[in-house]
Amino acid sequence: MAETLKEDSIMIREVWDYNLVEEFALIREIVDKFSYIAMDTEFPGVVLKPVATFKYNNDLNYRTLKENVDLLKLIQVGLTFSDENGNLPTCGTDKFCIWQFNFREFNIGEDIYASESIELLRQCGIDFKKNIEKGIDVVRFGELMMSSGIVLNDAISWVTFHGGYDFGYLVKLLTCKELPLKQADFFKLLYVYFPTVYDIKHLMTFCNGLFGGLNRLAELMGVERVGICHQAGSDSLLTLGSFRKLKERYFPGSTEKYTGVLYGLGVEDGTTTTVAN
């Protein structure tokens, strides 16, 4: 079970340009059996705030997300796969496998970033020079993602924590375009690529007394971290474990009615933009 995994039982598969094709080949082999995917991204923080005024917070939240995602560049994506019982793939090894994809686009010497975010990532072991030299091209990643079976697939359930920015970067990567101006158009794209989405932060609003970030939730749920905080692979595994514990404790029945909502988004000009799955 994902929530009882220990450090020595996990292999974080570091993915660079040289092994990207091989790792996606492994993912294609497991995706039918391991159809829950917990996802986390690392990016250069939030640097822009819209100058316009908005009547509704969700409109402000989306515009802030759009302007930052359009401008900034992805650093890491972490993916943890599990089956419906929380079991993780081993991919022919004696360890459970999760994936951490490292991208080349962000250049700390040339690109805009939030200083505190980059310093935190550096302290957590991200080597920005290595990413430039050996990292993945985002366009190539998007092409392989499209043919991998993990997107455009009704059988896959995606799990994030406060996942607006995570999905914003993936939608930008998959479309090779800036995010739509209208939030409703963003959600239309989201549901094409990711038909079933869970945002743990949204689920927590139905759990009396639960608040705060992923680390706090994991601690409350008794889920131990494996790997380094603020690296996408480790965070995606912690997301999966927390999701499973939350479901067991607070949602004993079906959770389908909670899909399709990203925390802080989903209302435009006072009208709901999300749709039932």
UniProtKB/Swiss-Prot annotation:
Q: Name one GO cellular component term.
A: nucleus
Family the entry assigns: Belongs to the CAF1 family.
Q: Domain of life, per the record?
A: Eukaryota
Where, by residue number, does a divalent metal cation bind? 40, 42, 166, 235
Provide the catalytic activity annotation.
Exonucleolytic cleavage of poly(A) to 5'-AMP
Q: Which UniProt keywords apply?
A: Cytoplasm, Exonuclease, Hydrolase, Metal-binding, Nuclease, Nucleus, RNA-binding, Transcription, Transcription regulation
What is said about its interaction partners and assembly?
Component of the CCR4-NOT complex, at least composed of CRR4 and CAF1 proteins.
Q: What is this protein called?
A: Probable CCR4-associated factor 1 homolog 10
Record the organism: Arabidopsis thaliana
Its annotated compartments are:
Nucleus; Cytoplasm
Q: Which SUPFAM superfamilies match?
A: Ribonuclease H-like
Q: What class of enzyme is it?
A: hydrolase
Q: Which cofactor does it need?
A: a divalent metal cation
- Pfam families, sorted: CAF1
**In UniProt terms, what function does this protein have?**
Ubiquitous transcription factor required for a diverse set of processes. It is a component of the CCR4 complex involved in the control of gene expression.
